[in-house]
């Protein structure tokens, strides 16, 4: 019975060693480069923001223009 347990322990140790040993020679991954932003993306973001502001102002001002008495659709 003792030899059976020792064989099981040796088999378990061999299995764990076989699974872990390939990772011993593995190289660590290189760190990812830090994200950088260039001026073009910042300019594009500002342009989109200004376009949204212009669109909102257009929709806010247009109903005031349409409600005047001199405005006709045809």
UniProtKB/Swiss-Prot annotation:
Pyrrolidone carboxylic acid: residues bearing it: 27
Residue positions of covalent lipid attachment, annotated as GPI-anchor amidated serine: 37
Glycan attachment residues as annotated in the record: 31, 33, 35
Position of the signal peptide: 1-26
UniProt KW keywords: Cell membrane, Glycoprotein, GPI-anchor, Hydroxylation, Lipoprotein, Membrane, Proteoglycan, Pyrrolidone carboxylic acid, Signal
Post-translational modification: Contains 4-hydroxyproline; hydroxylated on Pro-31, Pro-33 and Pro-35.
Subcellular location: Cell membrane
Residue(s) carrying 4-hydroxyproline: 31, 33, 35
One Pfam short name: AGP
The UniProt record lists the keyword Lipoprotein: yes
Cellular component annotations (GO), alphabetically ordered: plasma membrane; side of membrane
Topology with respect to the bilayer: Lipid-anchor; GPI-anchor
Propeptide: 38-74
The keyword Lipoprotein is annotated on this UniProt entry: yes
UniProt similarity note: Belongs to the AG-peptide AGP family.
Function: Proteoglycan that seems to be implicated in diverse developmental roles such as differentiation, cell-cell recognition, embryogenesis and programmed cell death.
Protein name: Arabinogalactan protein 20
Native source species: Arabidopsis thaliana
Chain's gene name: AGP20
């Amino acid at each position: 019975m003792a030899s059976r347990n020792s064989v099981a322990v040796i088999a378990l140790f061999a299995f764990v060693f076989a699974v872990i040993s390939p990772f011993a020679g593995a190289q660590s991954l290189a760190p990812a480069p830090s994200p950088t932003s260039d001026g073009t993306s910042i300019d594009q973001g500002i342009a989109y923001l200004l376009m949204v502001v212009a669109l909102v102002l257009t929709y806010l001002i247009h109903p005031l223009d349409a409600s005047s008495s001199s405005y006709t659709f045809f």
